[in-house]
Amino acid sequence: MAKANTAVRVRKKVRKSVSEGIVHVHASFNNTIITITDRQGNALSWATSGGAGFKGSRKSTPFAAQVAAEHAGKVAQEYGVKNLEVRIKGPGPGRESAVRALNSLGFKITSISDVTPVPHNGCRPPKKRRI
């Protein structure tokens, strides 16, 4: 009986080399989402406070945002990213700590901009909390 040819070619996924990227930090009151993209907006890596192992009210802490930024930054370093442009959106507590974590990983931060959407008297905000 003839042997079947079992040799299977496995191609390695080729990682594109990107020198500079954009970090989108979405800091809400409940969570922090960090996405690192290339110049065209294609996502290279992303991380969240909840995905970093924090649950409940601990997701909304600055330390959780720092850990999430380190996760996303380490994956982006595998793509060869050196320079980052930071765009921060939202009022959450993880805004500055995410940027500091990326800076401590050795990235050169070229610019930091706040892109929080501000309504020109749009929708009515929710009522004030009474505790």
Swiss-Prot record:
Biological process terms in GO annotation: translation
Pfam families in alphabetical order: Ribosomal_S11
GO cellular component: ribonucleoprotein complex; ribosome
Gene Ontology molecular-function annotations: rRNA binding; structural constituent of ribosome
Key words of the record: Ribonucleoprotein, Ribosomal protein, RNA-binding, rRNA-binding
Transmembrane regions: none
Family matches, as InterPro entries: Ribosomal_uS11, Ribosomal_uS11_bac-type, Ribosomal_uS11_CS, Ribosomal_uS11_sf
Xref: SUPFAM superfamilies: Translational machinery components
Domain of life: Bacteria
Protein transport among keywords: no
Family: Belongs to the universal ribosomal protein uS11 family.
PANTHER family listed in its UniProt record: 40S RIBOSOMAL PROTEIN S14/30S RIBOSOMAL PROTEIN S11
Described function: Located on the platform of the 30S subunit, it bridges several disparate RNA helices of the 16S rRNA. Forms part of the Shine-Dalgarno cleft in the 70S ribosome.
Subunit structure: Part of the 30S ribosomal subunit. Interacts with proteins S7 and S18. Binds to IF-3.
Protein name, UniProt field: Small ribosomal subunit protein uS11
